[in-house]
Amino acid sequence: MKEKIHPEMKLVTVKCACGAEHKFYTTLENVRIDVCSNCHPLYKGMSGASLVIDSEGRIEKFRRKYKDQQY
């Protein structure tokens, strides 16, 4: 490998919104994530059908819009 052309890898702490911290080697400085293996529903044993994340009421908006439609 050529000298001084590759980015420097360093050990950083990745912080999740749930409060969990993981350590990784990366070229980035600070890493913050929304979902990790500690709080993701599929890692927690929940099925995707049993958990719906609806942060802005989109499901209710959809149901109101199409409630009179026949399928």
Curated annotation (Swiss-Prot):
GO terms for molecular function: metal ion binding; rRNA binding; structural constituent of ribosome. GO terms for biological process: translation. Keywords: Metal-binding, Ribonucleoprotein, Ribosomal protein, RNA-binding, rRNA-binding, Zinc. Zn(2+) binds at residues 16, 18, 36, 39. Gene3D superfamilies: Ribosomal protein L31. InterPro entries: Ribosomal_bL28/bL31-like_sf (IPR034704), Ribosomal_bL31 (IPR002150), Ribosomal_bL31_A (IPR027491), Ribosomal_bL31_sf (IPR042105). The keyword Coiled coil does not apply. One of its GO terms (cellular component) is ribonucleoprotein complex. SUPFAM superfamilies: L28p-like (SSF143800). Binds 1 zinc ion per subunit. Its cofactor is Zn(2+). Binds the 23S rRNA. PANTHER family: 50S RIBOSOMAL PROTEIN L31, CHLOROPLASTIC, LARGE RIBOSOMAL SUBUNIT PROTEIN BL31C. Part of the 50S ribosomal subunit. Belongs to the bacterial ribosomal protein bL31 family. Type A subfamily. This is Large ribosomal subunit protein bL31. It comes from Pseudothermotoga lettingae (strain ATCC BAA-301 / DSM 14385 / NBRC 107922 / TMO). The lineage of its organism: Bacteria, Thermotogati, Thermotogota, Thermotogae, Thermotogales.
